[in-house]
Structure formats: structure tokens, C-alpha cells
Swiss-Prot record:
Name this polypeptide is given: NADH-ubiquinone oxidoreductase chain 4
Function recorded in the entry: Core subunit of the mitochondrial membrane respiratory chain NADH dehydrogenase (Complex I) that is believed to belong to the minimal assembly required for catalysis. Complex I functions in the transfer of electrons from NADH to the respiratory chain. The immediate electron acceptor for the enzyme is believed to be ubiquinone.
Originating organism: Lycodon semicarinatus (Ryukyu odd-tooth snake)
Entry EC no(s): 7.1.1.2
Topology within the bilayer: Multi-pass membrane protein
First and last residue of the signal peptide: none
Subcellular location: Mitochondrion membrane
Length: 445
């Protein structure tokens, strides 16, 4: 684990001293090498400070795999920037990756909290410095306020747990039962921060703003990894805190399922492509929240599968939206129509990614949603109404997104250049792991 961490750390000075001509080739290939080395981390591993198990290893692997892809995706936009800013951008991306990986590796909740909150700063810089419109400052403010407001109770809860147990609380050990009132306050304090990060419907307003204003690398990292920190945190807290009573997690499950349905309905009325994909993330994370709250073996396996699947799928959708944006300079879906006759290969990628997003079998998205649906139905048969409605609307807006961007008459007031092999490679590296994991889901479940 330390080897991989040091390799990632050394990428920061590398980006700062490389020759301009070699900057992207070297950093991308170096980070691909780190991604391949990180495959060895799938085996459980533990020492005093760092700890990996079947919950954190797949998410850690996902974060390392997406790091070179964020560099590749932002290459076109970054080439227009001065060299020093390109170096700074790559360094901040690497720093963000370092904080994320240490969050997943941390063996005690204090270190996990510090790294969890440290991810805020690089993400904020990426959104507010490299975003496209002036609204990026508002998006950055929303992101910061939601994160900081909910993280204060989490810090208080962690300090209380540390004082009660007289240890930095290794994840293997469960806290002794205190009074019911204390338990309730601890759960609400811990869940607040992670639910805002997921985000649950109601605490989600920062997400569409951040996604729409962030550059492509920021959108990819936000959708694929930063949202998963919330799910990972909830799973970790269920291992430490005393077992939840049904009357506490019932409102959260209802809120997350109803929120998923409402987010899906919001998707149907979106005109902005990135905003639609962002609301789609809110609905998928609603299912993950519901699954983690039930705390059965099946539901946790389903939550893990859906988190990994959503990481690849949403990141791929943002890459495709960016490919369209680079050519049309607009995110409005009605202005980006008719791409099937201009870029037919990109239409194929759109179709495959949307099918993954709908969760058609035999994709890993389907495996995750099937496990979640089974555990929800077993827990309370009525939940199938909200779940089924959510699935139906997901299929509707995914097909609407595909048809409105790819079919129809092209707008003829723009010059469209052909796709680069870089963009095709980017899509292959998103979709290939999804297909391979679908063949062997026990790697992540």
C-alpha cells in the first residue's frame, strides 16, 4: 500500500519538472502504470495505519484506474492554457487522488475524517479555477458550505467515539452500547456528512451546480469517486456504531427511495446534458443509501456493485458529454442533435453507456440493482413500487438523452472535426472494465 502511495506522491514533482513536450505522455503513462500496480491491492492487507478489505479495495482500484483517464480527458482543454497552469492542474489532480486513496486506506476513523475533508480543497480549486462560466464561484460556495456544515457534527461524533473507547477506533471493533439518546445523536451526526456527500435528495443542490461548472476532470472525479466516499463512510460507520434500530433508518430509506424517484423525474425535464447526468447520479446514489441502511449481506454487496458500476458509467457519460461540448460549445441537448450521421462511432459509445446506465443484463449495474431490489423487497415489499417507478423513469430519460443527442437533423452552423483516437481509447477504458467485472462480479461483491 505504501509503495502505491509513494508512487502517487512522486507524480507531483514529476509533473512540475517534466519537459513541455513530454508532460501529458509521461504523466498519463506513469499513472496507468500505478493503476496496473494497484490491481495487487485487491487482496486484503492491513498494518497499524493502513487497512484494506473487500469494501475499500474495489473503490481504491476504481480511483486509481480513473486517474489517468481524467488526465486524458482534459488534455484537449488544457492544451490552450499556459504551461505553468497545466502543471498546476496535473499536480492538484494527483493531490486529490492521494487524499482519496488515503481515505479508503485509513485504518482509523480520525485519519479517514481528515482525508475525507482534505478532498474538499483540491476539488474546490479544480471547480473554481478551471470551470467554464462565472457561476463556478457559486457552485464552489455551495459545495463548500454543504460539506463544511455537515462535517462539523461528524468531527464531534468521532471525538466522542475516541474518548469513549480510549482508542482511535480500528474498524474491526464495535463501540459499546451507550444510552439510546446518545446512539441516536451519534448516528444522525455521522450520517449527515456522508448523506450530503452521496448526496441524498434534499442535500443534493450542490451536485448539479458543481457538475455543470466543473471541467471534465472535475466532473469525472466527482461522479466516479467523491460520491462513493459517502457510501463508503456509511458502510464503515455501521461497523463501528451500535446497531441501528428500525425506527431510525426507516425515514432514511423512505427518503432515499422517494428522493431517487424525484431525482429521476427531475432528469426528464432537464435540457442541460451535464445537469441530466448529475441528477441521474443522485437517483443511483439514492438506491445505494437505501441498500447500506438495511445492512444485510445482500444489500451491502448490491451497494458495492452499484457504486463501482455507477463510477464507470457516469464517468463515461461525462466524457461523452464533453466530446460533444468540445465540438458544439453547448450543453443544451436540442442543439447537439444529429451526431449519429457525423460521428457514428461516438453514437455506438453513447448507446453502450446508456444501456449500462439503464442496467440492462448482464452488466454489473444490473447485478447491483438486482441485489438491492431483492434485499429491499425482502425487507418491505411495498418498496418495490418506488423502486420499479425509479427504474422505469431511468430507462425513459436515458433513451431520451440518447435520441435527442444522436438522432434528428444536425445543426449546420458549426464545423465538426472527427473524433480522436484518444477519445475512443477513453471510452474503451471505461466500458471494458465494466464488461469484464460483469463476467466475474465476485471481485467486488
Amino acid at each position: 500500500m505504501l509503495k502505491i502511495t509513494f508512487m502517487t506522491m512522486m507524480l507531483i514533482p514529476t509533473t512540475l519538472i517534466l519537459k513541455p513536450k513530454m508532460l501529458y505522455q509521461t504523466t498519463t503513462s506513469y499513472s496507468f502504470m500505478i493503476a496496473l500496480f494497484s490491481l495487487s491491492l485487491l487482496e486484503p492487507n492491513s498494518n497499524t495505519y493502513l487497512h484494506l478489505d473487500s469494501t475499500s479495495a474495489p473503490l481504491l482500484l476504481l480511483s486509481y484506474w480513473l486517474m489517468p483517464m481524467t488526465m486524458m480527458a482534459s488534455q484537449h482543454a488544457m492544451n490552450k492554457e499556459p504551461l505553468q497552469r497545466q502543471r498546476t492542474f496535473l499536480s492538484i489532480l494527483t493531490l486529490l487522488q492521494l487524499f482519496i486513496s488515503l481515505t479508503f486506506m485509513a485504518s482509523n476513523i480520525t485519519l479517514m475524517y481528515i482525508m475525507f475533508e482534505a478532498t474538499l480543497i483540491p476539488t474546490l480549486i479544480i471547480i473554481t479555477r478551471w470551470g467554464q462560466q462565472t457561476e463556478r464561484l457559486t457552485a464552489g460556495t455551495y459545495f463548500m458550505m454543504y460539506t463544511l456544515t455537515t462535517s462539523m457534527p461528524l468531527l464531534t461524533a468521532i471525538l466522542f467515539i475516541n474518548n469513549t473507547t480510549n482508542t482511535p477506533t480500528l474498524f474491526m471493533q464495535m463501540m459499546q452500547t451507550t444510552s439510546p439518546w446518545t446512539e441516536l445523536m451519534l448516528w444522525i451526526a455521522c450520517l449527515g456528512a456522508f448523506l450530503a456527500k452521496m448526496p441524498v435528495y434534499g442535500l443534493h443542490l450542490w451536485l448539479p451546480k458543481a457538475h455543470v461548472e466543473a471541467p471534465i476532470a472535475g466532473s469525472m472525479v466527482l461522479a466516479a469517486i467523491l460520491l462513493k466516499l459517502g457510501g463508503y463512510g456509511i458502510i464503515r460507520m455501521t461497523q463501528i456504531l451500535p446497531t441501528m434500530k428500525t425506527d431510525l433508518f426507516l425515514p432514511f430509506i423512505v427518503l432515499s427511495l422517494w428522493g431517487a424517484t424525484l431525482a429521476n423525474l427531475t432528469c426528464l425535464q432537464q435540457t442541460d446534458l451535464k445537469s441530466l447526468i448529475a441528477y441521474s447520479s443522485v437517483s443511483h446514489m439514492g438506491l445505494v443509501i437505501a441498500a447500506t441502511m438495511i445492512q444485510t449481506q445482500w444489500s451491502l454487496s448490491g451497494a458495492m456493485a452499484l457504486m463501482i458500476a455507477h463510477g464507470f458509467t457516469s464517468s463515461a457519460l461525462f466524457c461523452l458529454a464533453n466530446t460533444t461540448y468540445e465540438r458544439t460549445k453547448t450543453r443544451i441537448m436540442i442543439l447537439t442533435r444529429g451526431f449519429h450521421s457525423i460521428l457514428p462511432m461516438i453514437t455506438t459509445w453513447w448507446l453502450m453507456t446508456n444501456l449500462m446506465n439503464i442496467a440492462t443484463p448482464p452488466s454489473i449495474n444490473f447485478t447491483g440493482e438486482l441485489l438491492i431490489a431483492s434485499s429491499l423487497f425482502n425487507w418491505c415489499p411495498t418498496t418495490i413500487i418506488l423502486f420499479g417507478l425509479s427504474m422505469l423513469i431511468t430507462a425513459s430519460y436515458s433513451l431520451h438523452m440518447l435520441l435527442s443527442t444522436q438522432t434528428g437533423t444536425p445543426t449546420l452552423n458549426m464545423v465538426t472535426y472527427p473524433t480522436h483516437s484518444r477519445e475512443h481509447l477513453l471510452m474503451v477504458l471505461h466500458i471494458l472494465p465494466l464488461m469484464l467485472i460483469s463476467l466475474k462480479p465476485e471481485l467486488i461483491i
